[in-house]
């Protein structure tokens, strides 16, 4: 039996890791971007980001003051689990108090803060059923400088691949420097209005620099990435070659009359941490 306490402790560890330690794939992408940059301000900004990442790990403190809204992805296998949501919520509360992590969650109308990063329907928990002998939990802290620039379109099927490219590029360029570029762009194609955005967010969990195994999707990722970086928006919107580190796409089948497109923009701090709990 995977108890509530086991889940709580694992979520505490993952949330703490996610806000403090940036993945090696993102760090390498930033280092590679620095080598390619010719713009002085762009170099300065990427150097500052890399130094910030280093200091966060050394001091054990969050890499950004916006520690985001905790988004949780669960893969639930053939295991016995007790009080999953309660365990997740208690782990988030514990990390908020002890790391500490800035409390960001408020009532949308009164703006009163819960002070524990948990609230009505928060954290959002996506559950995927799998045929394995473990419970896997991923924490994605999503900052709202980037989240506020997400976009969704119920495109017509006739708009096709060119319409997808145009909407994604247009959405990122419209955001300019607001999402703290260099960004990572998650794109969801297909499904429904809500599913395409969920897929876009899930796409952010993919390795930066690693292409989609579907050749057609991989080509689309590369084409969108090239177009965005040709804009010259650059790091923090101050000019340069690197507006976006990578574009990640997930697709779903959809209704014959629709082509939903969801664009989820993530700042340079593409933070997430994953852990597994086995039944034994």
Residue ranges of each PLM-predicted region?
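Non-transmembrane, aqueous-exposed alpha-helical and coiled segments at domain scale
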Residues: 1-187, 192-280
């Amino acid at each position: 039996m995977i108890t509530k306490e086991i889940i709580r402790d694992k979520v505490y560890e993952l949330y703490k890791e996610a806000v403090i330690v940036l993945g090696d794939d993102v760090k390498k992408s930033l280092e590679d971007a620095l080598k390619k940059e010719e713009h002085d301000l762009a170099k300065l900004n990427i150097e500052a980001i890399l130094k910030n990442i280093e200091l966060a790990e050394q001091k054990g403190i969050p890499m950004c003051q916006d520690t985001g809204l905790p988004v949780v992805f669960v893969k639930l296998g053939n295991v016995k689990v007790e009080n999953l949501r309660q365990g997740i919520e208690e782990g988030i509360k514990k990390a908020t108090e002890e790391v500490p992590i800035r409390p960001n969650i408020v009532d949308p109308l009164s703006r009163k803060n819960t002070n524990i990063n948990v609230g009505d329907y928060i954290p959002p928990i996506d559950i995927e059923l799998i045929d394995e002998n473990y419970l896997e939990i991923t924490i994605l802290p999503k900052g709202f400088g980037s989240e506020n620039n997400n976009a969704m379109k119920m495109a017509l099927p006739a708009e096709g691949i060119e319409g997808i490219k145009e909407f994604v590029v247009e959405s990122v360029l419209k955001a300019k420097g607001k999402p703290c570029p260099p960004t990572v762009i998650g794109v969801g194609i297909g499904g429904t209005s809500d599913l395409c955005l969920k897929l876009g967010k899930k796409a952010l969990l993919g390795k930066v620099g690693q292409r989609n195994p579907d050749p057609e999707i991989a080509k689309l990722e590369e084409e969108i990435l090239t177009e965005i970086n040709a804009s010259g928006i650059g790091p923090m919107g101050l000019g340069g070659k690197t507006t976006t580190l990578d574009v990640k796409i997930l697709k779903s089948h959809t209704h014959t009359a629709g082509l939903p497109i969801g664009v989820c923009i993530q700042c340079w701090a593409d933070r997430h941490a994953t852990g597994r709990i086995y039944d034994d």
